Amino acid sequence: LISPVRDPHMFTNKGILIPQLALFILQGLTPKKHEVKIVEEEYTELDYEEECDIVAISCLTSNAYRGYRIADAFREKGKIVVIGGIHPSLLPDEALEHADAVVIGEAEGVWEKILDDIENDKLQKKYHVPNPDLDRYIPKDFSTLSKKRKFNLIPLQTSRGCPYDCDFCCVTDIFGKKIKHIPVAHVVRDIKESGGRNFIFLDDNIIGHKKYARELFTALIPLNIRWIGQSSISFANDVEMMKLAKQSGCKGLFIGLESVVESNNHQFTKLKSLEDTKRSIKKILKLLLQYITVSTTHIIK
């Protein structure tokens, strides 16, 4: 299971280092009869002579070109190559020029099928299972991350999907408009079994469903962890939620201010007007910064 770097000649193993969650999802979905090796190219040099039957590569657009080069190299050696991730999901035909099969969207319900099909010599070109059942979210083995300390944050996910359909964003295309939640008990399980203390929630909006967020934050309090995540600017409207997030170990939030240009708002669907943005920023400065550190950004077009 491989996560490519963008450029193998420019390693950036400084600052906030987050491993590719997709690799650990695939590892958890793989039947025990198979041996799995995770290769984060950020830290591990690829061995093209590795004895293996299947090579699975997960990539974004930023590292897709590198991922394709890796795929081509392994295929030349007769290995079966499967590619997935955001970029291949949106451009599966392009990805198929470099792979034997492409996973479109989520891995649950797909990866197991791929392994069975390979064993039975029935591998298909494209695999896609929309809306997989996240109630059976498989445990992740993060123990090696905690022991080796190559990465300083362990990735977690509590939800997928987003009700907003902003022009610039691929989340809705990949995961749909409906927010799907991973049971809180499963999230707590992964945290406890990881042995780590520092985490990042990869959810696009950690408070996308307030009832679930309260349940999650409450369950995190006794775990004594530190975490950062992403949220919509509406977090500023709920002081009690901010306090609960702080108690649960929140140390920082990344909040997107997609645009400060009134005419662009139709592209993002989150804010009704520039005045909404101004009011929310004032609330953040007055309230949110009392509890947690905030980082903001906006999209430049």
Question: For each predicted feature, which ranges?
Answer:
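Acidic, low-complexity intrinsically disordered segments
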Residues: 1-194
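Structured beta->alpha junctions
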Residues: 59, 63, 87, 103, ...
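Catalytic cores of alpha/beta
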Residues: 92-97, 241, 300-301
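Radical SAM [4Fe-4S] cluster-binding motif and immediate context
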Residues: 138-287, 291-292, 299
